């Protein structure tokens, strides 16, 4: 019996070597594009709608510039500093990633070429810088931002990416679990953004007191792109179209929905009104919290993580922030400390608690090395579970230290050449002073509702001063002052 001929389109060829999985390559390119769309146009229009009208162009342009600048630097030197051969214990050797021979080789993970991996990792690096921008909107000198982006990418992002994600990184070898960037992207951007906001200084007092979004519907459109784009963000990190990719996507959306609802319920309980801005904040904290765990935890754990991510960052933002002199001093425009640093740290710790050994073996290919404390106790491997929690905590401390130090040094270096902050006169004007352009051909800042009682419209950090009371199961009163 003669053999059935193999379809010609599936035969190996110069453009399709035997090691290449066309399905995995196609999904990886699509996942990268989804992540890219989270930034362009997702965060561009989210920032453009969330800020005061006079800052819409500047906020959007900071994001667009960062995306382009990161891409340029990434292919010239930054990718191989993050994932290449070891230069120092925490760093890879800088080198071009543009040569055909290098681009067509199989990537260090996955059945696709280096070119695909470079693209995928680039959009992750780009969104990290754009998230940092959220902390300094409304006053950072654009020329300082133009310098900040390549410097921070080179001397901070590559450092943490190599240590945590590279196969040669010391935390990767120890066994840290950061499935899709809770540490490398979100904790880094939250800490770096808060640190940069400290050095740049605050917005004008009147802008800090009243900073209403100029277009809530536009902000919601950006938030929707951000949420749906997370399908590629977490679904692309198994580097294949397998079972763990499906689980990661489902867990991502389950956690996010739970977090959003939790945040909205807390707003209703304590502020008596559901807030659109609050819902977006809850959405973001849910997305961030599940990121380090998406493909390595069970669905029920994702729901629990959503409850935590919708409540703990809410409490730190609405209560602790207002009572802390340090937190009040630093003007973090988009609250990235809470939505990214705290939510990312929370996700990392909960990953150390709920990481399921079988799911980790699907992702890492190693069984019983990555064991959450919850399962470690069940399996009589409590010491392994405690070790995992310890590694997760060590990763948090490492990322905080690296980003505080590197971001501070970069800001101090930049201000030797250009001011970090715009002048008071230019901040009064906004986009017209910074770029000679305006977003809308209308007068005023859209501040018609001066008596608005939204807890988010006047300032992102309002104290919970009007106590809301609810009865607990025993009939006593629970108050939040």
From Swiss-Prot:
Stated induction or repression of this protein's expression: Accumulates in roots, in a RAM1-dependent manner, during colonization by arbuscular mycorrhizal (AM) fungi (e.g. Glomus versiforme).
* Spans traversing the lipid bilayer: 29-49, 59-79, 117-137, 142-162, 181-201, 216-236, 251-271, 276-296, 300-320, 334-354, 394-414
- The residues on the Extracellular side of the membrane are 1-28, 80-116, 163-180, 237-250, 297-299, 355-393
UniProt xrefs under PROSITE patterns: AMMONIUM_TRANSP
UniProtKB keywords: Ammonia transport, Cell membrane, Glycoprotein, Membrane, Transmembrane, Transmembrane helix, Transport
BP GO terms, sorted: ammonium transmembrane transport; response to symbiotic fungus
Localization, UniProt = Cell membrane
Q: Does the keyword Cell cycle apply?
A: no
State a single Gene Ontology molecular function. ammonium channel activity
Record-linked Pfam families: Ammonium_transp
**Positions bearing carbohydrate:** 114
Disulphide linkage map:
none
Topology within the bilayer = Multi-pass membrane protein
**According to its record, what are the GO cellular component terms?**
plasma membrane
Which InterPro entries does its entry note? Ammonium/urea_transptr (IPR029020), Ammonium_transpt (IPR001905), Ammonium_transpt_CS (IPR018047), NH4_transpt_AmtB-like_dom (IPR024041), RhesusRHD (IPR002229)
Ranges per topology, Cytoplasmic = 50-58, 138-141, 202-215, 272-275, 321-333, 415-481
- Protein task: Involved in ammonium transport. May be involved in arbuscular mycorrhizal (AM) symbiosis with AM fungi.
Would you identify the family this protein belongs to, as annotated? Answer: Belongs to the ammonia transporter channel (TC 1.A.11.2) family.
State the PANTHER family in the record: AMMONIUM TRANSPORTER 2 MEMBER 5, AMMONIUM TRANSPORTER MEP2
Query: What protein name does the entry list?
Result: Ammonium transporter 2 member 5
Instruction: Write the lineage as a comma-separated list.
Output: Eukaryota, Viridiplantae, Streptophyta, Embryophyta, Tracheophyta
């Amino acid at each position: 019996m003669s053999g059935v001929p193999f379809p010609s389109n599936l035969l190996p060829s110069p453009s399709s070597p035997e090691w290449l999985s066309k399905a995995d390559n196609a999904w990886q390119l699509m996942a990268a594009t989804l992540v890219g769309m989270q930034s362009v146009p997702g965060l561009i229009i989210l920032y453009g709608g969330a800020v005061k009208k006079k800052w819409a162009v500047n906020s959007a342009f900071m994001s667009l510039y960062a995306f382009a600048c990161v891409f340029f630097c990434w292919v010239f030197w930054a990718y191989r500093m993050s994932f290449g051969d070891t230069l120092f214990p925490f760093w890879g050797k800088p080198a071009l990633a543009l040569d055909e021979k290098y681009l067509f080789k199989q990537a260090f993970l996955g059945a696709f070429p280096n070119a695909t991996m470079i693209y995928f990792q680039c959009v992750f690096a780009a969104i990290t810088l754009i998230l940092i921008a959220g902390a300094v909107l409304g006053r950072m000198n654009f020329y300082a931002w133009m310098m900040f982006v390549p410097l921070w990418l080179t001397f901070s992002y590559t450092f943490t990416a190599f240590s945590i994600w590279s196969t040669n990184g010391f935390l990767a070898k120890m066994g840290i679990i950061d499935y899709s960037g809770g540490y490398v992207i979100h904790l880094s951007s939250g800490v770096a953004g808060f640190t940069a906001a400290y050095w740049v200084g605050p917005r004008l007092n009147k802008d800090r007191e009243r900073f209403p979004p100029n277009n809530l519907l536009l902000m919601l459109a950006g938030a929707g792109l951000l949420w749906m784009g997370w399908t590629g963000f977490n679904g692309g990190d198994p580097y294949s179209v397998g079972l763990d990719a499906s689980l990661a996507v489902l867990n991502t959306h389950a956690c996010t929905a739970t977090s959003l609802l939790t945040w909205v319920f807390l707003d209703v309980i304590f502020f008596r009104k559901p807030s659109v801005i609050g819902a977006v904040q809850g959405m973001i904290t849910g997305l961030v919290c599940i990121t380090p765990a998406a493909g390595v935890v069970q669905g029920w754990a994702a729901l629990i993580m959503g409850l935590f991510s919708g409540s703990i960052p809410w409490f730190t933002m609405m209560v602790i922030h207002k009572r802390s002199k340090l937190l009040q001093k630093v003007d973090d425009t988009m609250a990235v400390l809470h939505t990214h640093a705290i939510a990312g740290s929370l996700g990392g710790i909960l990953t150390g608690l709920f990481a399921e050994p079988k799911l980790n073996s699907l992702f890492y290919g190693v069984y019983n090395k990555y064991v959450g404390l919850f399962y470690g106790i069940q399996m009589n491997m409590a010491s392994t579970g405690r070790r995992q929690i310890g590694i997760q905590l060590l990763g948090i401390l490492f990322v905080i230290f690296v980003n505080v130090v590197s971001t501070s040094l970069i800001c101090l270096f930049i201000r030797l050449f250009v001011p970090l902050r715009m002048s008071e006169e230019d901040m009064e004007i906004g986009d017209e002073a910074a770029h000679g352009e305006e977003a809308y051909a209308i007068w005023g800042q859209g501040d018609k509702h001066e008596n608005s009682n939204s807890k988010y419209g006047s300032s992102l950090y309002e104290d919970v001063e009007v106590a809301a009371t609810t009865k607990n199961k025993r009939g006593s009163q629970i108050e939040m002052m």
